[in-house]
Amino acid sequence: MGVKTFTHSSSSHSQEMLGKLNMLRNDGHFCDITIRVQDKIFRAHKVVLAACSDFFRTKLVGQAEDENKNVLDLHHVTVTGFIPLLEYAYTATLSINTENIIDVLAAASYMQMFSVASTCSEFMKSSILWNTPNSQPEKGLDAGQENNSNCNFTSRDGSISPVSSECSVVERTIPVCRESRRKRKSYIVMSPESPVKCGTQTSSPQVLNSSASYSENRNQPVDSSLAFPWTFPFGIDRRIQPEKVKQAENTRTLELPGPSETGRRMADYVTCESTKTTLPLGTEEDVRVKVERLSDEEVHEEVSQPVSASQSSLSDQQTVPGSEQVQEDLLISPQSSSIGSVDEGVSEGLPTLQSTSSTNAPPDDDDRLENVQYPYQLYIAPSTSSTERPSPNGPDRPFQCPTCGVRFTRIQNLKQHMLIHSGIKPFQCDRCGKKFTRAYSLKMHRLKHEGKRCFRCQICSATFTSFGEYKHHMRVSRHIIRKPRIYECKTCGAMFTNSGNLIVHLRSLNHEASELANYFQSSDFLVPDYLNQEQEETLVQYDLGEHGFESNSSVQMPVISQYHSKGKEP
């Protein structure tokens, strides 16, 4: 008689093991490592940390067993970012909200927990909407629904909503009016890779029946006030801008996936808009932020708007020819241009100077940034107001980026800069697929596909699609008087016109950063006699031809208004 074998596989064993390990950690039993984060002590087990994080495995595997150094300091991690990751290692449950998402993402990247970092990135990029059903859900669930492998989104108020393992769309029962923002922001994500069954949490009396609510709420519009305040694209609420309120528009509804589609991901971004109405500006609590996605029609509408010169103005006004002039002087006039077909496209895309200066013009990017809510409020704590300029006695650039350390004079510039570190580029070109962080960058990019050239050099009639290309043309062409090469490399004797080129040259010679700092603190890199009388006379005698230039300084740039006032066409 043959030997009979029996194999038993327990699906709850891994869950029980994690629960018991977490109990041992809370009681302080068998903890063999101490982690210090910002002077706060955490006790844990080496085997659990090494199994969850490649960073800890590299740190702990190489240690000798008889070594008494069991304290590990994490200098680049905050307490608010480390606690959710430690709980995730022992419970397979990640609890994040809009207040600690940046800290958790930075800590997960530093600790090489890439799956958690990917989840945080998806949470930042996606739009999480909550649907409010009219009828109360059933309290009891079938046995098949209790064993459902779909993960749950659990809010801080205790409601649990079923959702697919890829976290596509969610529901919850929640009061709409005057609810705490902190409760609306917070949620708990069950890891799809963990063996923890989500059916263990179905004992709550507020569990939603996904199959029942699907047929009831299929055609119900979703209340956009329940969206997170900084969801895609970071909570831009157009309802508080009366000038940009559109006319009657069809109400869009959110179609929830059926029971057979629970394993599929929803669309990349879910757009939900109720009927657009103008709301009066009240308190901050009354203004409800909705989730918007820039559709192809809206992108086309944004691109077709007039490109005013004020929107294309740059902060570097010292290198702009005739910085006292308005950039409308650079716009192509259909009557004065001789390009032909290009002017027809420009005449359609660009208004006259009177229309660009009208009072009903839409606000620029800086004004729109005032109404944007960002998840970086913890890092932005300036001494001055967001709408005020720095005081004369204070620092020139009080707003500093916590990631790279770049400082800015305005809070709007810092907010726009933080989008670069987030990696979110919500504006995508529908022709070539290139993505941009700002809507204005997409607008200028679309002009290249349409063949519209909005800026023209009034000296050589060259046309450009952006003001940056025009500035580059003025630098590399012979339209401006060449600057003298006043920066000299003491190593090889090379001369340069600006310090930036000298820095690039010194880096090519493998100069360290400290050496560069000491090098530029002294004035030895400047030629001693670069501003003598002979060089000034040489620059004044520069052949300007028929173009009128001012000669009140050694380095001049053409003043376009003078050339235009003579009535000479290029």
Swiss-Prot record:
Instruction: Name the Gene3D superfamilies on file.
Output: Classic Zinc Finger (3.30.160.60), Potassium Channel Kv1.1, Chain A (3.30.710.10)
In terms of Pfam families, this protein maps to: BTB, zf-C2H2
- Principal subcellular localization: nucleus
Q: Phosphoserine-modified residues are where?
A: 135, 159, 161, 165, 191, 194
Modified positions (Phosphothreonine) in chain numbering = 200
Position(s), cross-link Glycyl lysine isopeptide (Lys-Gly) (interchain with G-Cter in SUMO2):
4, 290
Q: Where in the cell is it found?
A: Nucleus
SUPFAM superfamilies reported in the protein's UniProt record: beta-beta-alpha zinc fingers (SSF57667), POZ domain (SSF54695)
GO cellular component terms, semicolon-separated: nucleus
Point to the regions of Low complexity compositional bias: 304-318
Residues covered by region (Disordered) = 194-220, 243-267, 295-369
Residue spans, zinc finger C2H2-type: 399-421, 427-449, 455-479, 487-511
Q: SMART domains annotated for this entry?
A: BTB, ZnF_C2H2
Q: Does the UniProt entry include the keyword Nucleotide-binding?
A: no
Keywords, comma-separated and alphabetical: DNA-binding, Isopeptide bond, Metal-binding, Nucleus, Phosphoprotein, Repeat, Transcription, Transcription regulation, Ubl conjugation, Zinc, Zinc-finger
Q: BTB domain: which residues?
A: 31-98
* Biased segments, Polar residues type: 199-220, 352-361
User: Its Gene Ontology molecular function terms?
Assistant: DNA binding; zinc ion binding
What is the documented function of this protein?
May be involved in transcriptional regulation.
This protein is called what? Zinc finger and BTB domain-containing protein 44
Instruction: Provide the species name.
Output: Homo sapiens (Human)
Identify the gene encoding this protein. Answer: ZBTB44
